[in-house]
């Protein structure tokens, strides 16, 4: 009974936090407009795990464009140690994109690091001075209360954060039998710029738009908010309209005859998402010491064999064999 009550209370607490956070974000959108904001909480609300069975990280569902992401991870780490996972999100300097309101804005970046079970964000009291300096202005969040091993960062200004340092604490299998020494996979995702699709499935203005009908363009209307309406008639005299969001750059003009599927705008996207997998070994000190002793033993055995062989050769030479 107590266990059920605890589970229900925990679920209600998590739901309440999510609702309050969503309300806060909703007010923020109106009070503090940020045209290039990316919201990791959309993924947190829709997916229990940000990595699909196919291996794709769900950020790619909205950030359709692909761009490279790199990561630096130690080959091996000791138990209960702090190490750095560095995510590199490269793009050209001073690059700008169109915001949701159609204006030109700097790119922002974000990253996700999916660690093996037991690995988590290192507590700040264990950060070195170097790590503290490298993570200034960076705010880390875990994907959910139950998933300490999935760490999110962003959105952050891209110009100052093309490299994001994640301080990670490794587990200690000697103290917790749920974890084992061995080789593990780390999944990393990095993004720069806005997505091409909203979580609702609608296309953002960060897209190439094509004609949904054929015909001749009779007029192009521009509204106060920057959105545009393309009016056209086909050969049968039917009228159609193409609605374009703010910030798009037209490739067509009045009087042009276009076919269905023809490009209406330039492709404004300059960003993209990339992901990769890395491997890390959780090393046992006892095993390392054992290996060293083993190799020393093998080396000494080889030396003894060589010395013994030379001794035998000397005896044989003395006896004239």
UniProtKB/Swiss-Prot annotation:
Coiled coil: none annotated. It is a single-pass membrane protein. InterPro entries: Cyt-f_TM, Cyt_f, Cyt_f_lg_dom, Cyt_f_lg_dom_sf, Rudment_hybrid_motif. The keyword Lyase does not apply. SUPFAM superfamilies: Cytochrome f subunit of the cytochrome b6f complex, transmembrane anchor, Cytochrome f, large domain, Rudiment single hybrid motif. Pfam families: Apocytochr_F_C, Apocytochr_F_N. Residues 1-38 form the signal peptide. The chain crosses the membrane at residues 288-308. Its cofactor is heme. GO terms for cellular component: plasma membrane-derived thylakoid membrane. The keyword Ion transport does not apply. Keywords: Electron transport, Heme, Iron, Membrane, Metal-binding, Photosynthesis, Signal, Thylakoid, Transmembrane, Transmembrane helix, Transport. GO terms for biological process: photosynthesis. Binds 1 heme group covalently. GO terms for molecular function: electron transfer activity; heme binding; iron ion binding. It is found in: Cellular thylakoid membrane. Heme binds at residues 39, 59, 62-63. Component of the cytochrome b6-f complex, which mediates electron transfer between photosystem II (PSII) and photosystem I (PSI), cyclic electron flow around PSI, and state transitions. The 4 large subunits of the cytochrome b6-f complex are cytochrome b6, subunit IV (17 kDa polypeptide, PetD), cytochrome f and the Rieske protein, while the 4 small subunits are PetG, PetL, PetM and PetN. The complex functions as a dimer. Belongs to the cytochrome f family. NCBIfam families: PRK02693.1 (NF002736). This is Cytochrome f. It comes from Prochlorococcus marinus (strain NATL1A). The gene is petA.
């Amino acid at each position: 009974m107590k266990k059920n009550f605890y589970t229900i209370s925990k679920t209600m607490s998590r739901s309440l936090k999510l609702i309050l956070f969503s309300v806060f974000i909703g007010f923020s959108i109106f009070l503090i407009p940020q045209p290039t904001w990316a919201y990791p909480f959309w993924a947190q609300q829709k997916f229990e795990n940000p990595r699909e069975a196919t291996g794709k990280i769900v950020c790619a569902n909205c950030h359709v464009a692909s761009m490279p992401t790199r990561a630096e991870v130690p080959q091996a780490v000791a138990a209960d140690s702090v190490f750095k996972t560095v995510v590199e999100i490269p793009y050209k300097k001073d690059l700008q994109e169109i915001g949701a309101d159609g204006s030109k804005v700097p790119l922002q970046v974000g990253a996700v690091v999916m660690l093996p079970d037991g690995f988590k964000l290192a507590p700040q009291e264990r950060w070195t001075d170097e790590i503290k300096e490298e993570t200034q202005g960076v705010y880390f969040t875990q994907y959910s209360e139950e998933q300490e091993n999935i760490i999110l960062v962003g959105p952050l200004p891209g110009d100052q954060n093309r490299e994001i340092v994640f301080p990670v604490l490794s587990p200690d299998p000697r103290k917790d039998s749920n974890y084992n020494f061995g080789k593990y996979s780390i999944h990393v995702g990095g993004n720069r710029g806005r997505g091409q699709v909203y979580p609702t499935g609608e296309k953002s203005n960060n897209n190439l738009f094509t004609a949904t009908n054929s015909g001749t363009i009779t007029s192009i209307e521009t509204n106060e908010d920057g959105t545009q309406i393309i009016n056209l008639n086909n050969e049968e005299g039917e009228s159609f309209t193409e609605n374009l969001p703010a910030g798009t750059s037209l490739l067509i003009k009045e009087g042009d005859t276009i076919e269905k599927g023809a490009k209406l705008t330039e492709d404004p996207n300059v960003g993209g998402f990339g992901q990769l997998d890395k491997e890390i070994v959780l090393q046992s000190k006892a095993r390392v010491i054992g290996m060293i002793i083993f190799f020393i033993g093998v080396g000494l055995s080889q030396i003894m064999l060589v010395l013994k062989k030379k001794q035998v050769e000397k005896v044989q030479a003395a006896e004239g064999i």
